Amino acid sequence: MSVQTLTLPSPAKLNLMLHILGRREDGYHELQTLFQFLDYGDELTFAVRDDGVIQLHTEFEGVPHDSNLIVKAAKKLQAQSSCPLGIDIWIDKILPMGGGIGGGSSNAATTLLGLNHLWRLGWDDDRLAALGLTLGADVPVFVRGHAAFAEGVGEKLTPEYPEEPWYVVLVPQVSVSTAEIFSDPLLTRNSPPIKVRPVPKGNSRNDCLPVVARRYPEVRNALNLLGKFTEAKLTGTGSCVFGGFPSKAEADKVSALLTETLTGFVAKGSNVSMLHRKLQSLL
């Protein structure tokens, strides 16, 4: 009997650096960024149904079901594969929305990979990543599941192998609008491209940080507090702020001091996502 239910992780990501090279004619920005995963994230549970209905059973405040990337991913995969089956989906949500750690994109990728497995479609990662790109620029890296240097709008991926420290991640209670940051006139848009691999350690700058810190005092405060213990960085356009530590004990110690006033968590960096490790264990 085939497996009809499946629970999969939906990991967070960090942008270890983010350089903006310029704006394209279509309005998108040319980027260079380095993605790494965290062993921390949401959890999605899927149950196959035979009537073709796609049903997300978890409510998201302010997000209509049909606008949710989970539902969009499921419907696109169903349509493009001509699959007659449907799916029930539940999510245990812990990743913040608008945090810059890839919550929605990761959920979409977990949905594509989970349904590909449950519906027995046999799609490879290239095909799933191409579909994922139509949902968002960050979806392909979650589909492929390996730390990567990304170019273009974030979709041209080259595997990378950065160190895997323990991270303290702070979550300022504010949702940052990516569109707002990328339209800010003071945003740096002319960083010279990095042409050396692996990415040199000195290139850890995030071009969005000055704009986000100026617009959002909550983010600026988190950067200042974490910066007392380690180099504090912004992931994506925020709002989440992170810093690396060589051991869990050190990360836990700093986190305990900071989370008295700020929300945050400790997680291990990983160059292979916990989603892909789980899928490999099912083979």
Curated annotation (Swiss-Prot):
Residues given in the record as ATP binding sites: P96, M97, G98, G99, G100, I101, G102, G103, G104, S105, S106
Record GO biological process: isopentenyl diphosphate biosynthetic process, methylerythritol 4-phosphate pathway; terpenoid biosynthetic process
Keyword list, A-Z: ATP-binding, Isoprene biosynthesis, Kinase, Nucleotide-binding, Transferase
Gene3D superfamilies, per database record: 3.30.230.10, GHMP kinase, C-terminal domain
GO MF annotation terms: 4-(cytidine 5'-diphospho)-2-C-methyl-D-erythritol kinase activity; ATP binding
Top-level lineage group: Bacteria
EC number, UniProt record: 2.7.1.148
Catalysed reactions, as listed in the record: 4-CDP-2-C-methyl-D-erythritol + ATP = 4-CDP-2-C-methyl-D-erythritol 2-phosphate + ADP + H(+)
Disulfide bonding pattern of the chain: none
Record-linked SUPFAM superfamilies: GHMP Kinase, C-terminal domain, Ribosomal protein S5 domain 2-like
Pfam families, A to Z: GHMP_kinases_C, GHMP_kinases_N
Residues at the active site: K13, D138
Keyword match Lipid metabolism: no
Database matches in NCBIfam families: ispE
Family membership noted in the UniProt record: Belongs to the GHMP kinase family. IspE subfamily.
Function, in words: Catalyzes the phosphorylation of the position 2 hydroxy group of 4-diphosphocytidyl-2C-methyl-D-erythritol.
Stated name of the protein: 4-diphosphocytidyl-2-C-methyl-D-erythritol kinase
Species this protein is from: Pseudomonas fluorescens (strain SBW25)
Lineage, broadest ranks: Bacteria, Pseudomonadati, Pseudomonadota, Gammaproteobacteria, Pseudomonadales
Name of the gene encoding the protein in the UniProt record: ispE
